């Protein structure tokens, strides 16, 4: 069993981009970070990079859409640590072109593929990890959403996203926000806090090189929500210090 005084965080999709930077920033706070990665070798490379920076990092084979991986990850964390303090549901995919409204052209296959990773896998993995999170003195769940999941902003002419419509991706993040609200309510009598984070438009594989934000800033909202004090919010939707409309 590892040091019982150190917090333990699992970051899905933690081997690159915002996930890796989230692991880096949490690790810099003295938190043990578990780098969840679909490809174990890439996860190990990311963990090795963090270790060179003095961070207690471990790689964990975790394809979020694989039920066997989800169960094995929960069992491994339980054996090694006996609990989980922080779950950052960071892994996500997008396959649509933001330059055109895809509502009339998105295939059922695309809808199912995106929802499988961005919504169903999050629900399933969180369910697998909840028994471990309940053993934490202050469990925190962060669902990496997007401003593109805001129905209010999508429906408001002149909003920052009114002209940006990626139907499957946007809908998957709206569904994820609904899960955040419902899970926070279900856990309202516990010490676990659940929130949705919008990282911003960040220079990643998903965001593209033309995005205005650097990765170091894109991780800040997730890190803040992962380390909330006992009097912090739950069931919210945030970017940096701002609350976003559902």
Feature map (PLM): residue ranges:
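Canonical Rossmann dinucleotide-binding motif of NAD(H)/NADP(H)-dependent dehydrogenases/reductases
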Residues: 2-34
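Structural signature of the Rossmann-like NAD(P)-dependent dehydrogenase/reductase core
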Residues: 11-12, 89-90, 140-146, 193-198
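Conserved glycine-rich Rossmann-like NAD(P)H-binding loop of the short-chain dehydrogenase/reductase
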Residues: 29-45
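The beta1-alpha1 cofactor-binding region of Rossmann-like NAD(H)/NADP(H)-dependent oxidoreductases
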Residues: 40-41, 61-75
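A glycine-rich helix->loop->beta "capping" turn
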Residues: 53-56, 76-89, 95, 107
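Conserved mid-core alpha-helix of short-chain dehydrogenase/reductase
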Residues: 69-72, 113, 121-128
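Catalytic loop of short-chain dehydrogenase/reductase
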Residues: 93-115, 120, 134-188
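C-terminal helical subdomain
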Residues: 174-177, 189, 196-197, 204, ...
